[in-house]
Amino acid sequence: MKALAKLERAPGLTLTDVKKPEVGHNDVMIRITRTAICGTDIHIWKWDDWAQKTIPVPMHVGHEYVGEIVEMGQEVRGFAIGDRVSGEGHITCGFCRNCRAGRRHLCRNTVGVGVNREGAFAEYLVIPAFNAFKIPPEISDDLAAIFDPFGNATHTALSFNLVGEDVLITGAGPIGIMAVAIAKHVGARNVVITDVNDYRLELARKMGATRAVNVSRESLRDVMADLHMTEGFDVGLEMSGVPSAFTSMLEAMNHGGKIALLGIPPAQTAIDWTQVIFKGLEIKGIYGREMFETWYKMVAMLQSGLDLSPILTHHFKVDDYQEAFATMLSGESGKVILDWTAA
């Protein structure tokens, strides 16, 4: 089958032929129709330090996808041939304390699809049936293909009550932009997002941001004054991993504020801990999606009017993958979709 693979320890990916995967007793085989390019895939493409330490070579990658079940293991229940599915990219052990307590998103033995094992940038993907998630007919393939990052945004944004709250989002990547739409959808008052990328800040405006702030030109404090915010933000969603962004968030938070951290800062990042302690801030780390509460929340929000269509900015056939990755690397895109139906 055709697949996008890392064949050598160097930048880039190669469209190549690989062996079709085999289906185990508890697995489903999915014929892939759409995939999306993730920031993780960009790290793999660039072959940065993280990728060099993490990604087996050779291996085909990718973990944002939708497709149709074409084969099932003999023990699989609850699915049928022809079901349209996406899937949870974190394969958990099922036996550690957190798994057995129902907190599978906190499994200490997680294996990542397209990171630690063969991925979805291929004509076919095999995953445990437990990880598959049925997609309702009213949700398009393009939207279903981005359920993985949409889930990151949902898990982060819904970590705290947002109704009537003032929310600061630092980092206008696709996940941060989707978090804007989620926060507004569930009833936040002011949703302010910061970045230095004008293209993506404009996308955030289209997704409902109260203010989209280019911090290279505009002061967050001035924006807060314009919005008559006298006490600071109630909730912070840190999506960038940029230390200066986190610092500005800590300074802008109200006492008793709550922060969810999805962005990954450098290992030795220093912050002013007095901001955390004397303000009584609550900080929560976010990894992946809650299984499967986050997935049900995603579907419910889309069915109740959440519009993510502005984030779907570019579409390519898989044969044009190099142009697709170049578009993502340019910084002037939202989500980039690859069509596998012509593969």
UniProtKB/Swiss-Prot annotation:
It catalyses: L-threonine + NAD(+) = (2S)-2-amino-3-oxobutanoate + NADH + H(+). InterPro entries: ADH-like_C (IPR013149), ADH-like_N (IPR013154), ADH_Zn_CS (IPR002328), GroES-like_sf (IPR011032), L-Threonine_3-DHase (IPR004627), NAD(P)-bd_dom_sf (IPR036291), PKS_ER (IPR020843), Zn_alcohol_dh (IPR050129). GO terms for cellular component: cytoplasm. Gene3D superfamilies: Medium-chain alcohol dehydrogenases, catalytic domain, NAD(P)-binding Rossmann-like Domain. Binds 2 Zn(2+) ions per subunit. Catalyzes the NAD(+)-dependent oxidation of L-threonine to 2-amino-3-ketobutyrate. Homotetramer. This is L-threonine 3-dehydrogenase. The gene is tdh.
